[in-house]
Amino acid sequence: MLWLSGCVSAPQSDALLTHFSQETGANPSVTLAARVHLEQVPFFPQEDFQCGPAALATVLQASKVDILPDALVSQVYVPSRQGSLQVEMLAAARRYGRISQILAPDLEGLLEQVQAGKPVLVMQNLGLSWYPQWHYAVVVGFDLPRGEIVLR
């Protein structure tokens, strides 16, 4: 039997944390707080393969749209893909009067949005580069001294 274990982090995460001073709680070149948590953002547990509707309902409710994940399933979930496509997620948000802003894949920019009180819907690969397992989640906070990002 072969057991493998490992831990990796992205270069942008390492760079941000390297420049962040735990002693002062701030980095002179980055205007990020040490800790932020958007506690008012709702949480919806997901059904199997339903991370898209759950994550989208989370950000829509945070922007004052009264919607539940079940109401979004028919709009964004593609059964043959066992998931939701980005284009469907963007279109559904627009149907509810919300225009999504696509962010560059930059950790600092993402954290700045969260610090500004905006939860960020992210698509993350929970698998491997050669065998991806895509998953939607919502970033609702961070703790830079601990190197943690809070997801719903």
Question: What is each model feature region?
Answer:
Residues 63:
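Extracytoplasmic/lumenal acceptor-recognition loop(s) of multi-pass membrane glycoenzymes
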Residues 51:
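Active-site-proximal loop/helix segment associated with metal-binding centers of metalloenzymes
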Residues 8-38, 42, 66, 71-152:
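Conserved active-site-adjacent core of cysteine acyl-enzyme catalytic domains
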Residues 3-6:
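C-terminal motif of bacterial Sec signal peptides marking the signal peptidase cleavage site
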Residues 55-60:
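Buried hydrophobic packing segments
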